[in-house]
UniProtKB/Swiss-Prot annotation:
Keyword Metal-binding: no
One Pfam match: Ribosomal_L11
GO BP terms, alphabetized: translation
UniProt cross-references to HAMAP family, sorted A to Z: Ribosomal_uL11
Protein name as it appears in the record: Large ribosomal subunit protein uL11
Cellular compartments per GO CC: cytosolic large ribosomal subunit
SUPFAM superfamilies noted in UniProt: Ribosomal L11/L12e N-terminal domain, Ribosomal protein L11, C-terminal domain
Amino acid sequence: MAKKVVAVVKLQIPAGKATPAPPVGPALGQHGVNIMAFVKEYNERTAQQAGMIIPVEITVYEDRSFTFVTKTPPASDLLKKAAGIESGSGQPNKKKVGKVTRAKIREIAELKLKDLNANDVEAAMRMIEGTARSMGIEVVD
């Protein structure tokens, strides 16, 4: 028989740098999960993606066991890295902070495709372009 799911916890943690300190500790502690076991397993799984923020979905079961699924980094993080900027623009329509090529957009869209609500790469590219525009990043050919 399948285990009963008690909670699904979603967090965004830097790859390979999870610690029992907030936000991880309190989020998992309230469900009685072994925090150190999660931290150790998460850091092992994400060690090769150092420097990126990795969203993770943790499913907590009735017997206090857990499973987790890592997702692809947020589109905004990938765009910031591609444009070589620290943060997006506070006034995206007035002040542009960087440029990204369509080829880079396609690369990001292909990486994010499995996590996006899109059927093909073209639709995913349009979503990523929209994110870029809202951050004040110019999309050039």
